[in-house]
């Protein structure tokens, strides 16, 4: 059975349109609860970000789980990695996050964590889908006996527990005293958490975009819109800036000069710092989107590098397969398995700050030897079958032309987004003009297949 609803990061879409409806959410809760109950599940934890639609979907998921005989514990707005952590520490059987991460407020999504705080396997998601399809298409949604229904409770100290966990990943011998940091919480799930973590560790914190109203999440702010953070760092003459996305699993940073430091650069800094401390860095996992310059810089340190499919779940899978501990995406999902089971922007930022304090260097100076290849990414809106566009002869010809011209001095990647109706065209080259030229060539070929 192929995937019908689960993308690279759970189920996601526009609120009010199938599948992000209360009816679907209830049936998904029931299907997941039924699968989990069969293996002994007694309780799941449900968290969410700050989207207005989170209330509706949370209630629907509750009903579905309770109908399947599974108890529910609610946390309120919390970062995605906080739910992964709490699922494990509370000995819950599974965790659920209601969030569309970096997407606008009118989108939402639902994703699951296992009892170890890791994302569900493909096999588990397919089993949930099997029951879900039967409930949607055949109406086969049953309810357990009245005395077996699930109950709902609220975890009142969830945020405080997670703050202490984050602080616990930072060495006791170090302090952030003397650092001025601007923090952009994207009006998202970490709005009441991130600033307090850094303050309690001694930093002077200027907090921006920390007043969620249900519809301003990720709106011209956070890890996908860095302008406001860059401006704030310069205005306040801060040492650096930290940007999270709506569910705080993605990290981007800004140096004291207002320059953006992306996930590849941060991952390089983390690997180099660990190596300098004498820790064994067996290798680093990136993705198909990771920059060639990043790969070459790791090679100069003697650190092996492998690419996973795009999506943090696939980075985790390859980390487990190789036994390596460090990986991530240039978009800012950073995986540090010595500390967390999933991407955690706050924890990752603390390890970057640790690296800077130990080296005595500023953020820009700490990565001077990293020479990134110019990378051009063009998103083409999809209004048809992606497979048709990706395999169309004219598109294949454009890709072949670009690859032949670039040779070993560049890369071409063409793929369908796992979270949005887009085909992503990425071209990387030593020469920025060539990168842009061939990205436009391929994008034009894709647009011709899917005219607006």
Swiss-Prot record:
Purpose: Catalyzes the conversion of glucosamine-6-phosphate to glucosamine-1-phosphate.
EC number annotated for this UniProt entry: 5.4.2.10
Binding-site residues, Mg(2+): 101, 245, 247, 249
Gene Ontology cellular component terms for the protein in this record: cytosol
Recorded family membership: Belongs to the phosphohexose mutase family.
Name this polypeptide is given: Phosphoglucosamine mutase 2
GO annotation terms (biological process): carbohydrate metabolic process; peptidoglycan biosynthetic process; UDP-N-acetylglucosamine biosynthetic process
Active site: 101 (phosphoserine intermediate)
Keywords (A to Z) from UniProt: Isomerase, Magnesium, Metal-binding, Phosphoprotein
Keyword Nuclease attributed: no
PANTHER family cross-referenced by the UniProt entry: PHOSPHOGLUCOMUTASE (ALPHA-D-GLUCOSE-1,6-BISPHOSPHATE-DEPENDENT) (PTHR42946:SF1), PHOSPHOHEXOSE MUTASE (PTHR42946)
Modification sites for Phosphoserine: 101
Disulfide bonds: none
Coiled-coil features, chain-numbered ranges: none
Catalyses which reaction(s): alpha-D-glucosamine 1-phosphate = D-glucosamine 6-phosphate
UniProt GO MF annotations: magnesium ion binding; phosphoglucosamine mutase activity; phosphomannomutase activity
Positions of transmembrane segments: none
Recorded superkingdom: Bacteria
Modifications after synthesis and translation: Activated by phosphorylation.
Gene: glmM2
SUPFAM superfamilies: Phosphoglucomutase, C-terminal domain, Phosphoglucomutase, first 3 domains
Cofactor: Mg(2+)
